[in-house]
């Protein structure tokens, strides 16, 4: 069996790697190729392109990179049209993957979208594009399946892989000791995300805010 997969940025690489490992436990001889990062490579994916090539944020940046992204997508369509996989999985990155899925589906290739766009929160009309593009949506959140059921879009709730790795309840004192934090006092977690572009643009603002909070 041969799987094609495309993930953008670090979070998609993490999810894609967990999916590949899970599938290989059931299908040991599974062949995987596509777009991914170091975690997906370690899980056994032959990467045609690196996930960082899709990690573009901001209107100006996207417009500047649009010709390159369209060329990349056309190249993937041609590659998999000429040598079709059994299944294609798009991991998040809906602006890139849904268009790719639609083109591949027209060629008779089964397509899966892993991670639903936030259609339940905004731009709900995208659900019709999703219905045209994919044979199945793998949902991280339980209420997402109920949303797709209303539109007769096949969907399955699979949960988030990190839920299997991080306990629901943590010993606060133990983890404070591990992190070298005082037993008492307030702790604020700063989570800037995984996109390099966002870190580059907003890193100084995060650092300034942390310094301001620490001085209060």
Regions from the language model: what does each represent?
Residues 1, 186:
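Nucleotide donor/acceptor-binding cores
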Residues 2-178, 191-199, 212:
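Active-site and donor-binding regions of nucleotide-sugar-utilizing enzymes
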Residues 203-208:
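Short acidic-capped amphipathic helix/loop micro-motif used as an active-site/signal-coupling element
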């Amino acid at each position: 069996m041969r799987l094609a997969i495309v993930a953008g940025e670090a979070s998609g690489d993490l999810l894609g790697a967990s999916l590949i490992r899970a599938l290989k436990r059931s299908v040991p001889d599974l062949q995987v190729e596509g777009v991914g990062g170091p975690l997906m490579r370690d899980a056994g994916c032959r990467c045609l392109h690196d996930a960082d090539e899709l990690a573009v944020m901001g209107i100006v940046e996207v417009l500047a990179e649009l010709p390159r992204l369209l060329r990349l997508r056309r190249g993937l369509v041609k590659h998999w049209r000429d040598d079709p996989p059994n299944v294609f999985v798009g991991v998040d990155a809906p602006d890139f993957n849904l268009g790719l899925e639609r083109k591949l589906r027209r060629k008779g290739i089964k397509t899966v979208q892993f991670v639903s766009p936030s259609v339940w929160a905004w731009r709900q009309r995208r659900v019709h594009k999703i219905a045209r593009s994919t044979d199945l949506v793998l949902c991280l959140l339980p209420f997402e399946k109920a949303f797709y059921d209303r539109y007769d879009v096949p969907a399955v709730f699979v949960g988030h892989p990190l839920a299997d790795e991080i306990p629901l309840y943590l010993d606060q004192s133990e983890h404070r000791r591990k992190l070298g934090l005082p037993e008492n006092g307030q702790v604020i977690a700063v989570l800037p995300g995984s996109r390099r572009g966002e870190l580059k643009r907003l890193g100084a603002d995060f650092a300034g805010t942390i310094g301001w909070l620490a001085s209060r």
